[in-house]
Amino acid sequence: MHQSGEATRPEGLKILVADDEANIRRILETRLSMQGHEVLMACNGAEALELFRGSEPDLVVLDVMMPELDGFAVVERIRAQSEVPIILLTALGDVADRITGLQLGADDYMVKPFSPKELEARIRCVMRRASTGQGGGVGAGGSAANVVVVGDLSVDFNRRQAFRADERIRLTGMEFSLLELLVSRSGEPFSRGEILKEVWGYTPERHVDTRVVDVHISRLRSKLEDDPANPELILTARGTGYLFQRIVDSVASEGP
């Protein structure tokens, strides 16, 4: 399962690749297998879902345009039950597709035609963020908790978990890493380019690249804010980017 300790490194992952183009499946299967990954191949969305449910992969790479079920439908159904990392493959001109996929819960996207090496780099970055993103950090008996509390929201950075009124908030590894970055410099803005580089590991080459940040901010607000349309925690810094509200005396240590 993607929660396992094996996800702390890029080697030895179980990766589900779904694409209706046989040449892309062949190239990715060859490249990823050579790196020691177990690669599961699907040629349509229905097959991808069946393989996902039966194999619990560590990572999913999905083409958007597939027969039977498109990539959007697959992302939506996976996200209803899992925070497994998802990378979408989209056509060059389909900016709207990229935004839709991110809104549904994809962690990142690659534009076709793409370099297999670049995809491998994206996989490494996404898996670093996901490796402890499911709460696999310090467990019972570990070091004192590093917890930030703001109102009824508490964020445990050791366990990489967030709670509102003692109810666990489901965050993907990328969403938690984004939250962690903003809180690390609360009250100070980050530009979209800074966030993209720190969390996703690459520098924006096109304006649309920074929409990855905007969409993830929107998803994070929908999970953390009482009123996402009028956020009080994750604020917009006009002309700059985003910031987390200034935190004062909100770090708690583990009680007796």
Each model region followed by its residue ranges:
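DNA-binding patch around the recognition helix
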Residues: 170, 215-217, 221-256
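Acidic catalytic/metal-coordinating carboxylates
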Residues: 44-47, 70-73
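Conserved acidic segment of CheY-like receiver
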Residues: 11-23, 28-32, 60
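Basic, amphipathic DNA-recognition helix from helix-turn-helix-like DNA-binding domains
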Residues: 76, 80, 85-149
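A structural micro-motif at secondary-structure boundaries
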Residues: 148-176, 189, 206, 243-256
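Short hydrophobic/Thr-rich beta-strand motif most characteristic of the beta2 strand and flanking loop
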Residues: 36-43, 51
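Active-site beta3 strand of CheY-like receiver
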Residues: 55-61
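Receiver (REC) domain active-site loop signature in two-component systems and cognate sites
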Residues: 66
